[in-house]
């Protein structure tokens, strides 16, 4: 009961259900102020202060070089051991993959491993279109930005983040602060684990090793088992749509027709609608959906990436038998958690215990 109630409390603080969160549930540092022309922009307050040390006479605490090596190695190897068998593996840390992992991380009972072949996660979400800075997000995906506390300039049907990196860095920092998540960047997924017609994990290797198989002798991979794999590998390219391409190679799907020409208004709705479990054990999200279904590309608008990622997370939660927004069990869990005869909630809602 305690675990169920904690999960309900955590997952209900989501924009996925479609209703605007009350102000108290949003980032407390975010305020709303009118802008010229009637537009609204979330503004983040900040304060300046003197650093708590003398910048003219700074001296760091002494350390042995071997300690640094041991700390990095021990912690990384511990993570590899911990996540060798995990609940969900998210392949690809672009806007859809990060949104998916963030949503999953709200359930503290679900362990999430995010695998990204690049040193720098974020995919194409560090910039808008044509290497411009601003990110356009169509409504109602701005509710997800409200939840994260990302500032934006509000227009009638869309919002604009002044720099795409604000979204990517915020969702990433919020995600990585959760104790049930580990990001393995500079790691490539080379294959899938498939048993009896069900995807059961991924085959991994260092990204630089994966890129140099033709220049060295055999360099065998590692593996990571999981109950669910979420493939968010993006559209076609050297590392794009690799999940669905591999499914085609091994005969689990018939074809990967590729995405159609750009149509923003059709594309975003289609991407979210078609986000699903394409074969047992594997959910496809983001632009990889367009590759497998021949949906239009959307170009430089990012709302569908966020909402598709959230939907993929709730599909994964459903597959795990956890409260989710797909079958409405989040609301049922919340209703049970609301009865004082069943649970006691701490004042700050951080812990819930059996009554």
Swiss-Prot record:
The protein's required cofactors: Fe cation
Additional notes on this entry: Plant silencing THI1 exhibit reduced levels of thiamine and decreased resistance to the bacterial pathogen Xanthomonas oryzae pv oryzae and the fungal pathogen Magnaporthe oryzae.
Assembly description: Homooctamer.
Similarity remark: Belongs to the THI4 family.
Location(s), subcellular: Plastid, Chloroplast
Cofactor binding, note field: Binds 1 Fe cation per subunit.
NCBIfam families documented for this protein: sulfide-dependent adenosine diphosphate thiazole synthase
Processing after translation: During the catalytic reaction, a sulfide is transferred from Cys-218 to a reaction intermediate, generating a dehydroalanine residue.
Keywords recorded for this protein, A-Z: Chloroplast, Iron, Metal-binding, NAD, Plant defense, Plastid, Thiamine biosynthesis, Transferase, Transit peptide
Name used for this protein in its record: Thiamine thiazole synthase, chloroplastic
Disulfide bonds: none
Gene Ontology molecular function, alphabetical: cysteine-dependent adenosine diphosphate thiazole synthase activity; iron ion binding; protein domain specific binding; protein homodimerization activity
Residues bound to substrate: 96, 116-117, 124, 189, 220, 235, 287, 297-299
Species name: Oryza sativa subsp. japonica (Rice)
Positions bearing 2,3-didehydroalanine (Cys): 218
GO BP field: defense response; DNA damage response; response to cold; thiamine biosynthetic process; thiazole biosynthetic process
């Amino acid at each position: 009961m305690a675990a169920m109630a904690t999960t309900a409390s955590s997952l209900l603080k989501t924009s996925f259900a479609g209703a605007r969160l009350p102000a108290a549930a949003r980032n407390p540092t975010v305020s709303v102020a009118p802008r010229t022309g009637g537009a609204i922009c979330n503004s983040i307050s900040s304060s300046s202060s003197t650093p708590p040390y003398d910048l003219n006479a700074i001296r760091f605490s002494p350390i042995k070089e071997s300690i640094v090596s041991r700390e990095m190695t021990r912690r990384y190897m511990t993570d590899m051991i911990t996540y060798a068998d995990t609940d969900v593996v998210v392949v690809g840390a672009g806007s859809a993959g990060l949104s998916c992992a963030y949503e999953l991380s709200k359930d503290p009972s679900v362990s999430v491993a995010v695998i990204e072949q690049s040193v720098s996660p974020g995919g194409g979400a560090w910039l808008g279109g044509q290497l411009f800075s601003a990110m356009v997000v169509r409504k109602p995906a701005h509710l997800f930005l409200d939840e994260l506390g990302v500032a934006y300039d509000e227009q009638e049907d869309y919002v604009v983040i002044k720099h795409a990196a604000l979204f990517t860095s915020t969702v990433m920092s919020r995600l990585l602060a959760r104790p049930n998540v580990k990001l393995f960047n500079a790691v490539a997924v080379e294959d899938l684990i498939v048993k009896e017609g069900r995807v059961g994990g991924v085959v991994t290797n260092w990204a630089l090793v994966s890129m140099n198989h033709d220049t060295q002798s055999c360099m065998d991979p590692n593996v990571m088992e999981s109950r669910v794999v979420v493939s968010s590998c993006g559209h076609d390219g050297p590392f794009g749509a690799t999940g669905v391409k591999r499914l085609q190679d091994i005969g689990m799907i018939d074809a990967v027709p590729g995405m159609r020409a750009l149509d923003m208004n059709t594309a975003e709705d289609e991407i979210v609608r078609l986000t699903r479990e394409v074969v047992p054990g594997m959910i496809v999200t983001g632009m990889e959906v367009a590759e497998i279904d021949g949906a239009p590309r959307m170009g430089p608008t990012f709302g569908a990436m966020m909402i598709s990622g959230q939907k993929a997370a709730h599909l994964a939660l459903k597959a795990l038998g956890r409260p989710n927004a797909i079958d409405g069990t989040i609301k049922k869990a919340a209703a049970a958690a609301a009865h004082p005869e069943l649970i006691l909630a701490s004042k700050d809602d951080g812990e819930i215990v059996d009554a």
